[in-house]
């Protein structure tokens, strides 16, 4: 059985990290080799991305220039994520280790695109990257996502939201995800992310068992 490359996608607050952790634990209970490998990574470019999203790194004030800048950074980090000789996705798959990633190039299309020119630009940056075996899209209404983000902010001592965790931005991102997955030709599982955590986990497990 070949190792699987599974991508969890969704807007901020949709539960990708939680479900990624639960899926990793499921694989481990089954005695299967697996890693959870999120984007952005903890590599050098990934750290720059986090600084930019938190406002701690110079970025352009113009929205389109900012998204173009982020598009380049995410693509560079994605290349590192895929092809790092020790911990990269390709290396892990070659070792028969399942790879779960929270976010992939779909996120770049969803977050960094506002016009058709943006779509073409981001697609060019990511066109050489391999397709995942499965995409699990955690679909969540924006209002519920904002509620969850607010709750999380309180738990984290009022840490400021990242620039992508704003209502207007999330509405645009959700719309872009709808566009992406309406035309996606690969293997896709779209799930209701408003379900309780355990119920959503079981739905993911059911789908994963079909993949194996």
From Swiss-Prot:
Disulfide bonds: none annotated. One of its GO terms (molecular function) is ATP binding. SUPFAM superfamilies: P-loop containing nucleoside triphosphate hydrolases. GO terms for biological process: dTDP biosynthetic process; dTTP biosynthetic process; dUDP biosynthetic process. It catalyses: dTMP + ATP = dTDP + ADP. Its EC number is 2.7.4.9. It is an enzyme of class 2 (transferase). ATP binds at residues 10-17. Keywords: ATP-binding, Kinase, Nucleotide biosynthesis, Nucleotide-binding, Transferase. The keyword Transport does not apply. GO terms for cellular component: cytoplasm; cytosol. InterPro entries: P-loop_NTPase, Thymidylate_kin-like_dom, Thymidylate_kin_CS, Thymidylate_kinase. The keyword Membrane does not apply. HAMAP family: Thymidylate_kinase. Phosphorylation of dTMP to form dTDP in both de novo and salvage pathways of dTTP synthesis. Belongs to the thymidylate kinase family. This is Thymidylate kinase.
């Amino acid at each position: 059985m070949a190792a699987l490359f599974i991508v969890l996608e969704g807007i901020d607050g949709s539960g990708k990290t939680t479900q990624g952790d639960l899926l990793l634990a499921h694989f481990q209970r089954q005695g299967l080799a697996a890693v959870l490998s999120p984007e952005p990574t903890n590599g050098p470019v990934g750290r720059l991305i986090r600084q930019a999203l938190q406002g701690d790194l110079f970025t352009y004030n113009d929205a389109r220039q900012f998204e173009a800048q982020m598009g380049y950074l995410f693509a560079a980090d994605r290349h590192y994520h895929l092809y790092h000789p020790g911990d990269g996705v390709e290396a892990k798959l070659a070792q028969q280790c399942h790879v779960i990633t929270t976010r992939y190039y779909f996120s770049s299309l969803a977050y960094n695109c506002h016009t058709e020119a943006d779509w073409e630009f981001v697609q060019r940056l990511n066109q050489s990257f391999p397709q995942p075996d499965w995409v699990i899209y955690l679909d969540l209404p924006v209002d519920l996502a904002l509620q969850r983000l607010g709750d999380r902010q309180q738990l984290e001592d009022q840490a400021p939201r990242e620039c992508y965790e704003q209502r207007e931005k999330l509405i645009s991102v959700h719309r872009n995800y709808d566009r992406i997955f309406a035309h996606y030709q690969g293997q896709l599982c779209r799930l209701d992310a408003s379900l309780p955590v355990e119920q959503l986990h079981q739905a993911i497990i059911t789908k994963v068992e079909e993949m194996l």
